[in-house]
């Protein structure tokens, strides 16, 4: 064991923030957060588990049946053995098959449009590097949208002219100063603020702590009493609608506003368009059904008196509606955020200090004021003379693309066709955990001629590949990042902590070598003649130039890199007074939105003209395929929420699992009434099933969930036992969820649309194997 005197700390970062990692240069001993926030983030303690995990991919591996006959492989992906090969053998095999498929079927046959959360650095983003290589080789099929916000990304540009989900919010200082009421609607920031797309600046939870102590009226609207509600304790009211009925609840509130003359007609006339069409629906003039509080109560399970009370509270106070993303990850998900904007517009508080709505307070610390900052540039998926994506598919429709090559589909007003995908390369992502209906995915995954996975760990995706390449973790290479997707609060060196484990290589180096195989001089073309540190210096020097325009001076790169310290950017007083939509609301003609009318569109003629029955021209209540209202006897709604101690599937294998696993499986939260009906006790192993599959989970009995709803957090690694009817032993919720698009408009993920049965498990003991590498690896 290393002498403690030889240990030192290295500054680096991950999606969960800057960290100090204790090492002796070969072994990681511990890790902790580098920012003094007073709020513990469990994810920051897991670096040792990431680097030294037994589930690391150690060597290049090829599926046995594929290696024997690449053009006519035998065996089944996910069931075949793996054979260790050298790096040269693996890269030669990839190059040969890539060349064959591209020449035979064209660039659209190659899906390299994956994305994922492996690294937050500006250089070593695996998906970007993959796309850069494929651009050099002549193009590929890319992706549209993402799994997190596919529906919202599609609808919000029509409604307010931008995505909103990835944009800065009205500043937290103004919320704390001016808001009277703050509503968390389908948002659990105590969990989701642990991460960011870059590195977390870790300020959001401090603001929520201040909110807890502010004396304001705080309301959470969610089928589950989340960790955030527990954090606020008796200072927050929990309102629990039936899952998937948020639009009905909002319509009931909106009707109450009109019924009492509380809607702001002047704001609606000046800053919106289409309200009259929506009002005709709201009041029942167009369909004969007035969307009263009583009507809404029958659907959403919240009493009519409470609905009227919410309307009065929202009207009588400066109200900030902080909406999360879970409710738009449902069938007809576009309606949820469209309706919350409509409700905020009816209140007339958009563009005011502390009022309106926000769709990103729960992610990446939205509302933390943007600093005067020297912002890094980053590696691009394009390169000079290359060919970018020749086609793109909605990322959540990859399975349908594989099942139906050439098939017609509609997307965002366009008639499109799925490409004929023959080759998939997934780098830096975990599609087997984030895609719905796992068994359908596994069947479709057999169709391509070649599947390559670049991975640090033996995930389910890696186990279902033909070729698996061992990748470095972020702690085995050098990189740079910013903290705060919106604040740009810090510039952080992500310094290499330990050498690469086993035969792991940087994706940057792998794709550079493949580029040289593709064409003479390809290595130099891919790298542009720069090494890892030279690229980092280039990105840093761009930040220095940008900083100079903001009166922010950075030291020379060599000095910065040697210092092993982050740089905090200066505060910007203007950002601390930032109000989203303030300029527009003050003068809509001078500052129009980027919508068709220049105003907030409560009714969109463009969307109406598309004629989509699943996304009409204004927000509406549409009944999902699977919900409480059409459940069969004893079926329960399945809520797939963000986990507390993982980033989606990342760290599922780590020691953090000891903090949440029940019966050595993913926990499922069950209301006592539902548990009692089924003879289930706390800690029991239970079976959940529907027509799509079955899983085992560990029972957690809690009053903190709506009766008729069960919650299983997304991200557990699939662990299907083919000797036991394919039951997932680890509790991967997407075995149960329905793979259907949110609508023709967005084609977003609808992972919160599922019903399942539940019972106490009385079958044979099934050993967990999710985190075991293949026998030959």
Swiss-Prot record:
GO terms for cellular component: outer membrane-bounded periplasmic space. It is an enzyme of class 1 (oxidoreductase). Keywords: Metal-binding, Molybdenum, Oxidoreductase. Mo-bis(molybdopterin guanine dinucleotide) binds at residue 148. Gene3D superfamilies: 2.40.40.20, 3.40.50.740, Dimethylsulfoxide Reductase, domain 2 (3.40.228.10), Dimethylsulfoxide Reductase, domain 3 (3.90.55.10). One of its GO terms (biological process) is anaerobic respiration. Binds 1 molybdenum-bis(molybdopterin guanine dinucleotide) (Mo-bis-MGD) cofactor per subunit. This is Biotin sulfoxide reductase. It comes from Escherichia coli (strain K12).
């Amino acid at each position: 064991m290393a002498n403690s005197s030889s240990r030192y700390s290295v500054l680096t970062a991950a999606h969960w923030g800057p960290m100090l990692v204790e090492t002796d240069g070969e072994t990681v001993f511990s890790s902790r957060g580098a920012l003094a926030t007073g709020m513990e983030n469990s994810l920051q303690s897991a670096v040792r588990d990431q680097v030294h995990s037994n589930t690391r991919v150690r060597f290049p591996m090829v599926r046995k049946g594929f290696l024997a006959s690449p053009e006519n492989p035998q065996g089944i992906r996910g069931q075949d053995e793996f054979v260790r090969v050298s790096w040269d053998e693996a890269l030669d095999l990839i190059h040969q098959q890539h060349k064959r498929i591209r020449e035979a079927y064209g660039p659209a046959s190659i899906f390299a449009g994956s994305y994922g959360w492996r690294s937050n650095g500006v250089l070593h983003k695996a998906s970007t590097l993959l796309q850069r290589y494929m651009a050099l080789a002549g193009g590929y099929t890319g992706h549209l949208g993402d799994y997190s916000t596919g529906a919202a990304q599609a609808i919000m540009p029509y409604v307010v002219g931008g995505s909103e989900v990835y944009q800065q919010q009205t500043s937290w200082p103004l919320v704390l100063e001016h808001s009277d009421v703050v509503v968390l609607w389908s948002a659990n920031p105590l969990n989701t603020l642990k991460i960011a797309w870059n590195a977390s600046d870790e300020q959001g939870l401090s603001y929520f702590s201040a909110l807890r102590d502010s004396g304001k009226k705080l309301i959470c609207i969610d089928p589950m009493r989340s960790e955030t509600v527990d954090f606020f304790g008796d200072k927050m009211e929990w309102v629990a609608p039936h899952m998937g009925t948020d639009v009905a609840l909002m319509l009931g509130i909106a009707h109450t506003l009109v019924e009492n003359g509380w809607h702001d007609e002047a704001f609606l006339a000046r800053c919106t368009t289409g309200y009259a069409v929506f009002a005709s629906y709201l009041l029942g003039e167009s369909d004969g059904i007035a969307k009263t509080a009583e009507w809404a109560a029958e659907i959403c399970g919240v009493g009519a008196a409470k609905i009227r009370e919410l309307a009065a509270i929202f009207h009588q106070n400066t109200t900030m509606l902080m909406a999360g993303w879970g409710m738009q990850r449902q069938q007809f998900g576009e309606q949820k955020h469209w309706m919350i904007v409509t409700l905020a517009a009816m209140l007339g508080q958009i563009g005011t200090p502390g009022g309106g709505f926000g769709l990103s307070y729960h992610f990446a610390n939205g509302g933390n004021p943007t600093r005067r900052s020297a912002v890094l540039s980053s590696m691009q998926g394009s390169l000079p003379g290359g060919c970018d994506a020749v086609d793109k598919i909605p990322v959540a429709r990859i399975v349908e693309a594989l099942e139906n090559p050439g098939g017609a589909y509609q997307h965002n007003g366009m008639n499109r066709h799925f490409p004929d995908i023959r080759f998939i390369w997934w780098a830096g992502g975990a599609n087997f955990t984030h895609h719905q209906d796992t068994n359908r995915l596994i069947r479709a995954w057999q169709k391509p001629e070649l599947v390559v996975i670049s991975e640090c760990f033996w995930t389910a995706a890696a186990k279902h590949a033909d070729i698996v390449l061992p990748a470095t973790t972020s702690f085995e290479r050098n990189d740079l990042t910013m903290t705060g997707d919106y604040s740009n609060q810090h510039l952080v060196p992500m310094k290499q902590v330990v050498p690469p484990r086993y035969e792991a290589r940087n994706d940057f180096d792998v794709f550079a070598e493949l580029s040289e195989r593709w064409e003479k001089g390809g290595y130099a073309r891919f790298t542009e003649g720069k090494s890892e540190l030279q690229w980092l210096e280039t990105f840093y020097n761009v930040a220095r130039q940008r900083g100079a325009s903001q009166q922010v001076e950075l030291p020379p790169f060599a000095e910065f890199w040697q210092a092993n310290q982050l740089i905090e950017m200066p505060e910007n007083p203007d950002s601390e007074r930032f109000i989203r939509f303030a300029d527009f609301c003050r003068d809509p003609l001078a500052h129009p939105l980027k919508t068709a009318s220049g105003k907030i569109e409560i009714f969109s003629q463009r969307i109406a003209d598309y004629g989509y029955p699943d996304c009409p021209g204004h927000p509406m209540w549409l009944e999902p395929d699977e919900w409480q209202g059409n459940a069969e006897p004893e079926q329960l709604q399945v809520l797939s929420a963000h986990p507390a101690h993982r980033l989606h599937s990342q760290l599922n294998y780590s020691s953090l699992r000891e903090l949440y696993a029940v019966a050595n499986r993913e926990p499922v939260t069950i209301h006592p009434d539902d548990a009692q009906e089924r003879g289930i006790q706390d800690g029991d192993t239970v079976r959940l099933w529907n027509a799509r599959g079955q899983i085992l989970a560990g029972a957690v009995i809690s009053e903190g969930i709506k009766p008729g709803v069960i919650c299983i957090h997304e991200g557990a690694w699939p662990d299907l036992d083919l000797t036991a009817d394919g039951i997932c032993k680890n509790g991967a919720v997407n075995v149960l969820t329905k793979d259907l698009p949110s609508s023709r408009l967005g084609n977003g993920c609808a992972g919160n649309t599922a019903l399942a049965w539940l019972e106490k498990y009385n079958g044979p003991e099934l050993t967990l194997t999710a985190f075991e590498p293949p026998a030959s690896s």
